[in-house]
Regions:
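Nuclease catalytic cores that cleave nucleic-acid phosphodiester bonds
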Residues: 34-148
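Short acidic, Gly/Ser-rich segments with clustered Asp/Glu that frequently serve as metal-coordination loops
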Residues: 8-15
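Generic enzyme active-site microenvironment
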Residues: 5-7, 95
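Residues immediately flanking
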Residues: 8, 33-34, 158
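Extreme N-terminal starter segment of soluble prokaryotic enzymes
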Residues: 1-3
């Protein structure tokens, strides 16, 4: 079971490559706006053929990164709802926008694996090499954050000495 949140403004139809391979228990949430609200006939056909559930989220834009903020908020909502139900699916953000790396790092620190992928095909095959720089950066930030947290919790305060 997986959720795929699509930054359609960013990846367009190419981000949907592999949608026909998804399973019945997968869900694709397409975030789009007036800036990117059209698709090819080929993509339309694949969306009709996929077993996955497709949800469309039209985003009203007017401020910079409006779609990104709504996608990030919806991801948090999904994670909360699924955890409340005792379900722990995989989460993928389909984008080429490196701005989502901090979101991935945050959820990883919370024990929730969120991955960034460029299209659904790579999301379906998580061993595929996609963006090693973003993944390496995420690992460095996570390790740095964990080390700082340990220091905060293991260092005695002046009152304790």
């Amino acid at each position: 079971m997986a959720y795929y949140l699509i930054d359609f403004e960013n990846v367009k139809s190419r981000g949907m490559e592999g949608v026909e391979l998804l399973a019945e228990e997968d869900t694709v949430c397409i975030f789009y706006s007036d800036n990117a609200d059209s698709m090819t006939f080929d993509l339309h056909r694949k969306l009709n053929e996929t077993k996955a559930q497709i949800i469309y989220h039209k985003v009203a834009v007017g401020t910079k990164n409006a779609l990104d903020f709504q996608l990030a908020t919806y991801l948090g909502y999904l994670i909360c709802e699924q955890q409340r139900e005792g379900i722990h699916p995989d989460y993928f953000i389909v984008t080429k926008d490196n701005g989502f790396t901090s979101l991935m790092v945050y959820w990883k620190a919370q024990g929730v694996p969120v991955r960034i992928t460029r299209n659904l095909l790579w999301g379906k095959n998580p061993t595929a090499e996609q963006n090693p720089a973003a993944e390496e950066n995420a690992m460095e930030v996570t390790e740095s954050t964990e080390q700082e947290s340990c220091l905060l919790y293991t260092s005695p305060s002046p009152r304790d000495s």
